[in-house]
Amino acid sequence: MSSLLNFYRKVLNVPLSLLVKSRAIPTDPVKELNLNLEQPIIYVLPYTSQTDLLILQKNCLSLNLPDPLQNNELNGQSLPRYVFLDEGRRFFKSKGAKSETESIFYRYLDLHRNNESLDVQLIPASVLWGRSPGKESEPHLRLMSSFQRIISMIWFGRDNFVRFSQALSLKYMVAEHGADEGIAQKLARVAKIHFAKQRYSAMGPRLPDRQAMFNKIIQSPAIKAAIEEEAKTKKISIEKARQEAEKIVNEIAADVSHESLRIADRVLSWLWNKLYQGINVQNGDRVRKLALEGHEIVYVPCHRSHMDYLLLSYLLYHQGLVPPHIAAGINLNFFPAGPIFRSWGAFFIRRTFKGNRLYSTIFREYLAELFYRGYSVEYFIEGGRSRTGRLLEPKTGMMSMTLQALQRGLTRPISIVPVYIGYEHVLEVDTYAKELRGAEKEKENAGLVLRVIKKLKNLGQCYVNFAEPIQVNNYLNQHFPEWKESQAEDSRPKWLNEAVDSVAHQVMININKAAAINAKNLIGSVLLASRQRALAREQLIEQVDSYLQLFKNVSYSDDVIVPNDSAEEMLNHVLTLPRSGVISEKDSFGEMIRLDRESAVLMTYYRNNIQHLFVLPSLVASIILHHESVSKDLIIKTVNRIYPFLKAELFLHFEENDVRNQVEAILTEFSAQRIVKYESDVLQINRARVRALQLHAAGVREILQRYYISLSILLEHPEISRAALEKESRSIAQRLSILHGINAPEFFDKALFSTFSASLKAQGYFDSEGNCILEKAKEAEEILRSLISVEVQLTIQGAMEKVEEVENTETVVKTAEAVTEKNE
């Protein structure tokens, strides 16, 4: 039988080598699963299939894993390196696989009794042929027959995945549970349950019968009530209101097609190869673990580009997970993109629900139905794409609906997975710059898509990092324990608004904790720190090295992606990127690297992607630079006064009682790099490296100037309203940006001044009547003034005087007009 089986495998390998191209999940199992190749491995497959076994063998050999067809030689015994859990359907019906498997498990377990150094690693491995879960109306099919497998080989040969799961230590099993035959049987049962969960996590629930789903939604009590109200309000018939409801459901709902997803996989594989030199994915194991545990997963990425929609779904598919249903703006529902996106899982959402109860009720019910059926969901919490490269303030509507779904009695735990997405080049960045200069946003259409496609070329690297998940049930239990109290389905519990804001804010913090530093955003940050946007090559390399050491030795977060390349390699990479704006020039003194004028504004976008990572070191450097000699305690006191504003603006994760330790670590690192002198708790400038200190300090310069503008106005006009404060601050910032050549568009962004005024209120700078507390504001203003150049202070003071002159003139004119009217 063995010779016949070997012959069959050789024959079978011929069509497999021609028709099947499989991909391993994860791509580097030795590293990602922490496998010890010094210890024996046994692979467990879910059911008997020589085809799957040969595909597994091919993948193992390419990944430098032990060959499953070679036996493990242990203590004089020769044991197979693979087992099948179930017999299933197969060409060769030999021994009952299940009993044989239990026997092999027992023999492996028994070997551990008298060999303490032995630790066999049991690795579940499954081969997926296609990823379609089928439709709800279709019958459940168990395993494929021989003929079906041949057809699958032809049809799904390019859609084949080998999934390696976390290894189980048999040494641990024996130590905890013993090594008898009952444990071997239990091991087999646990493995079967694992494979069932794994299959579900890869394929997801069956696709809905769209019309049946529509009917269920329309028949829900909440929508029936909304239809009746619509008819009453608009004075139309119930039937007409119902037709309007059906039209809305059809406008919103996705229409997922697995065949469309397969085509998308081919198209997007071509697209990414054309666009990017590489796609770097981190922490995918976090999501796979949640999926295996049966969590309802909600992906919440930052929003940089329209590419985000496509990229995340593509990567999840290649991580062995189900692509989510994606909340897409209604602006993307144009022909032909709309129907295509809908077939890939997009459901469409209008920009505003205000004044349309029928629409908001239907959308809420549709989202709740997706959760109820077990589909993963994705939405962009910022509401739209960031034009500045910074995270925007979260829009909480979708988050509110997510928490309400939990309140309605969803049985599965919900986990929110924040996702950081970063690019070395964003396709729309030119458009963003125009919009920030005042141009109107161009409506998405087929022509715009074609123009973007023409730009497709080498765009460098792309980064996707799955941040620390937020398990909503646990989060609410910890922070809002009253959430479990029963509520009427149509009521809004008191805890909800605060909980929604809290979870949304934590999402933004976790996204920033997973930021990716790359060659372009780091080199761009250093060049923008120089007032002339140019540095000698040696100085640039030295400063990039300084940042790399800082990020590695004083980590912002364990999730941050820090490049392994040298500063030299990073610079050479950026110089090869098309339209990077980074130029190399030579003169008689050597090589200079500069940023061309037109690209300076665009480069601020990429700097802003990672500004939060270096803003605290930059603030510390700025304090030392302006004081020249300063005590550690004064540095910490100054940082503590400014940090709450930075935390609110940049979604920083350090709690205020952690800031001292972080500042001390930064000071130690600056001293180790000889950027400063650190003796007896006093910090002094090291004149030999003052340029490095200046470049570090520049990262927070414009932020401090913005804060100083607002506080100066507040001290001059303590009774000023928040709206007027924000407006006047923005006007002065615009003038300052022109006179001092500040290229960053966000410098006079009204949203940032709004965030700062809200922070002032939260930090107690206003009394209960909304008036400024002068003493506190004066202290903060003095701290900021000590960190800002005299030239900038004079410009701000001059601008304030101009504003006051204009206001006085306007007052005189209005008074004169009033007198004239009275006399007439």
UniProtKB/Swiss-Prot annotation:
Q: Give an example GO biological process.
A: fatty acid metabolic process
The protein's predominant localisation is membrane
Placement of sequence motif HXXXXD motif: 302-307
Where does the source fall among the domains of life?
Bacteria
Q: What class of enzyme is it?
A: transferase
Sequence similarity: Belongs to the GPAT/DAPAT family.
Protein name in the entry: Glycerol-3-phosphate acyltransferase
Organism, by scientific name, is Actinobacillus pleuropneumoniae serotype 3 (strain JL03)
